[in-house]
Amino acid sequence: EKNPLYWDADRVRLNEIRYFPVSNESTEDRMFRAGQLHVTNVVPLEKCPIYIENGNPNLRIEPYMGTYFYRINTLHPILKNKDIRLALAFAINRKQIVEKVSKCGQAAAYSFTPPGSAGYEPDTDVPFNPELARSLLADSGYENGDGFPVLEILFNTSEGHRKIALAIQQMWQ
């Protein structure tokens, strides 16, 4: 509720703000389209290209300073090996992830600092290079991935994060 003790209370036009925590992106999208929510910053991955194509007036795509990354457990016996970690990095097609999975105008990031950060464009030495990834795995004793152990990826409950994790899983196979 509006705070009557706020120093400029007479100029505050909102009487109250209600926050509805919604754990499912599709549910939140439906609630927004049904008028149950006035604001959302969530667009389900599968809806974004449709909203862009149809010129949805409620869709605003703005620059967002963020990167998507996985922390690697370097204490894991296999992941202690730098070449294995590099192979995993070289096997990820970041451009394909933003074009085919997230599909909402994101830019592929190749470093922790996202593209366009105050004019900073980082040089990367980890481009998509599946041949080099296979070579590094083979040099580490895993020719064609034979004998390579199963690794687990932990991610939050977002459907978009699940789809990205599945894409990366496929790229690593």
Language-model features and meaning:
Residues 2, 60, 80-170:
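Append "and occasionally in soluble cytosolic enzymes with long acidic Gly/Pro-rich linkers
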Residues 3-50, 169-170:
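Ligand-site clamp/hinge motif
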Residues 12-14, 54, 65-67, 108, ...:
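Extracytoplasmic
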